[in-house]
């Protein structure tokens, strides 16, 4: 399966985001799936 946008993810895990990439989100202090274009 894949992780939906804004789902919590781990860059070191084998999971992949449905759309976008797994990146650090400062205001949540977590890694989350975000769209590459920066417009979620």
Curated annotation (Swiss-Prot):
Keyword Secreted appears in the UniProt entry: yes
Main location as per UniProt: secreted
Covalent S-S links between cysteines: 2-18, 9-22, 17-33
GO molecular function: sodium channel regulator activity; toxin activity
Keyword Disulfide bond tagged: yes
UniProt PTM comment: Contains 3 disulfide bonds.
Keywords in alphabetical order: Disulfide bond, Ion channel impairing toxin, Knottin, Neurotoxin, Secreted, Toxin, Voltage-gated sodium channel impairing toxin
Subcellular location: Secreted
Tissue: Expressed by the venom gland.
Gene Ontology cellular component terms for the protein in this record: extracellular region
Domain comment as written in the entry: The presence of a 'disulfide through disulfide knot' structurally defines this protein as a knottin.
The protein's role, per its UniProt record: Blocks the Nav1.2/SCN2A, Nav1.4/SCN4A, Nav1.5/SCN5A and Nav1.6/SCN8A sodium channels. Shows a slight preference for the Nav1.2 and Nav1.4 channels. Reduces the peak amplitude of the sodium current and negatively shifts the steady-state inactivation process. Does not shift the threshold potential of activation or the voltage corresponding to maximal current. Does not change the reversal potential of the sodium current. May act on site 1 of the receptor.
Family under the similarity heading: Belongs to the neurotoxin 19 (CSTX) family.
Note: Negative results: does not inhibit the sodium channel Nav1.8/SCN10A.
Name of the featured protein: Mu-thomitoxin-Hme1b
